């Protein structure tokens, strides 16, 4: 049996081919698995469970169909969809996990994260993250009319794209540092949790890294994004493998 991990699909009506690839993945590759874990950024944006979206409806229906076959589905919010709530989770048949979460993966304790908590060199983002994860902020935001939430999301996305563009046009080494995990934070996280494996997404740099932390040899698995293709991590009792899914 196999456990599947995905992240950073960034599903968006503007990219229907990726949504179709994901729906096909759910129909053809997930049934019979031990579990499916979605480690954040399933959607490009999420401003409340009450937002009308035919694409989100189709995704919820497909995920619920998977869950009804007996495959448990878990969702960990990312930086784009941290407002996914209990109403959508019920429709989709998944359980929302806190970030981070430790699971027993075929006998090996494994830390699951979206990954943005490891990017501590991006101090501006970490401040924004702390603000937007505050329950009081979220309650106030979700109480606003839909039009106001849409406007806020558009402004936030424009600011994010402008900052990314500014970083890319500047020092390339600085761009790579700010947009990737901080090695010191990775080491500290391994030591803090006392385990030897982390699985995360967020950085869109799929790879399997071997690092030394706390006097132990540890593994950090980075999931891939779903922009030009799909990406899935398959884990079983014998090991793990990152795979691409062609459009």
Swiss-Prot record:
Positions contributing to Mn(2+) 1 binding: 8, 10, 41, 204
PANTHER family xrefs: UDP-2,3-DIACYLGLUCOSAMINE HYDROLASE (PTHR34990:SF1), UDP-2,3-DIACYLGLUCOSAMINE HYDROLASE-RELATED (PTHR34990)
Protein name (database record): UDP-2,3-diacylglucosamine hydrolase
Sorted UniProt keywords: Cell inner membrane, Cell membrane, Hydrolase, Lipid A biosynthesis, Lipid biosynthesis, Lipid metabolism, Manganese, Membrane, Metal-binding
Gene that produces this protein: lpxH
Cofactor: record remark: Binds 2 Mn(2+) ions per subunit in a binuclear metal center.
Gene Ontology biological-process entries: lipid A biosynthetic process
GO molecular function: manganese ion binding; UDP-2,3-diacylglucosamine hydrolase activity
Organism of derivation: Xanthomonas campestris pv. campestris (strain ATCC 33913 / DSM 3586 / NCPPB 528 / LMG 568 / P 25)
NCBIfam families per record: lipid_A_lpxH, PRK05340.1
Similarity remark: Belongs to the LpxH family.
Enzyme Commission number(s) of this protein: 3.6.1.54
């Amino acid at each position: 049996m196999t456990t599947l991990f995905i992240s950073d699909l960034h599903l968006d009506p503007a990219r229907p081919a990726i949504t179709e690839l994901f729906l096909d993945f759910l129909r053809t590759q997930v049934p019979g698995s031990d579990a499916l874990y979605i480690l954040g950024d399933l959607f490009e944006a999420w401003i409340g469970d009450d937002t009308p979206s035919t694409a989100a409806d189709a995704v919820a229906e497909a995920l619920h169909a998977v869950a009804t076959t007996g495959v448990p589905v878990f969702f960990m919010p990312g930086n784009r969809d941290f407002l996914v709530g209990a109403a959508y989770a019920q429709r989709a048949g998944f359980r929302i996990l806190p970030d981070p979460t430790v699971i027993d993966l075929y006998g090996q304790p494994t830390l699951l994260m979206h990954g943005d908590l490891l990017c501590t060199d991006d101090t501006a983002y970490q401040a924004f993250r702390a603000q937007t994860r505050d329950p009081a902020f979220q309650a106030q935001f979700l109480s606003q009319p839909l039009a106001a939430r849409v406007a806020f999301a558009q402004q936030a996305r424009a600011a994010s794209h402008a900052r990314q563009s500014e970083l890319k046009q500047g020092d390339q080494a600085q761009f790579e540092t700010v947009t990737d995990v901080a090695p010191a934070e990775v080491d500290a996280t391994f030591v803090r949790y006392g385990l030897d494996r982390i699985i995360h997404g967020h950085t869109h740099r799929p790879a399997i890294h071997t690092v030394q932390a706390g006097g132990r040899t540890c593994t950090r698995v980075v999931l891939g994004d779903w922009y030009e293709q799909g990406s899935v991590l398959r884990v079983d009792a014998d090991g793990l493998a990152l795979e691409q899914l062609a459009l």
